[in-house]
């Protein structure tokens, strides 16, 4: 804020220019070319310098080298695939597991069409859609946590 020139709104000439809609060319700092040729490169180079500095000063621990001849006992997917992995792991019929996975996006597609009143509707006035969303979110979190646990306690999370 200290770099830009603030307009003096008590100046009658400036007020007359502003009333005509021509004040933006006569005060302040123009965005072109000052921001494009000065501020953007400073921000970009500063970001690169910060990332490279962090990479050099605090490199991430890679861990032990991979051994292609020793497979781990249980291979876990990335965290965002945990709910789907838990479905496939606990459902006895694999075809049913695949159908359940296909039912998730199909169900999500149908949620906006349940009791539509207008496109700016309050979610508290759409109890069915809100309930489907909340139950689906809780189920996804429950399955995701269960996927990281052993199979015998994965559905109950060891709580029951």
Swiss-Prot record:
GO terms for molecular function: electron transporter, transferring electrons within cytochrome b6/f complex of photosystem II activity; electron transporter, transferring electrons within the cyclic electron transport pathway of photosynthesis activity; oxidoreductase activity. CDD domains: cytochrome_b_C (cd00290). One of its GO terms (cellular component) is chloroplast thylakoid membrane. The chain crosses the membrane at residues 36-56, 96-116, 131-151. The keyword Membrane applies. One of its GO terms (biological process) is photosynthetic electron transport chain. Its main location: plastid. Keywords: Chloroplast, Electron transport, Membrane, Photosynthesis, Plastid, Thylakoid, Transmembrane, Transmembrane helix, Transport. It is found in: Plastid, Chloroplast thylakoid membrane. Pfam families: Cytochrom_B_C. It comes from the Eukaryota. The 4 large subunits of the cytochrome b6-f complex are cytochrome b6, subunit IV (17 kDa polypeptide, petD), cytochrome f and the Rieske protein, while the 4 small subunits are petG, petL, petM and petN. The complex functions as a dimer. Component of the cytochrome b6-f complex, which mediates electron transfer between photosystem II (PSII) and photosystem I (PSI), cyclic electron flow around PSI, and state transitions. This is Cytochrome b6-f complex subunit 4. The lineage of its organism: Eukaryota, Viridiplantae, Chlorophyta, core chlorophytes, Trebouxiophyceae.
């Amino acid at each position: 804020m200290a770099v830009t020139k603030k307009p003096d709104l008590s100046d009658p000439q400036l007020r007359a220019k502003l009333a005509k809609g021509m004040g933006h060319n006569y005060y302040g700092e123009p965005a072109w070319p000052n921001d494009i040729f000065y501020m953007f490169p400073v921000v970009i180079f500063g970001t690169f310098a910060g990332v490279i500095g962090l990479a050099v000063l605090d490199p991430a621990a890679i861990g032990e080298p991979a051994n292609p001849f020793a497979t781990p006992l249980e291979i876990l997917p990335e965290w965002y695939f945990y709910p789907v992995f838990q479905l496939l792991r606990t459902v006895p019929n694999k075809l049913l597991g695949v159908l359940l996975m296909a039912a998730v996006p199909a169900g999500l597609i149908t949620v906006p069409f349940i009791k539509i009143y207008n496109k700016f509707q309050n979610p508290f006035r759409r109890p069915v859609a809100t309930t489907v969303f909340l139950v689906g979110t809780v189920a996804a979190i429950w399955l995701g946590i269960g996927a990281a646990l052993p199979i015998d306690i994965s559905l109950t999370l060891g709580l029951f």
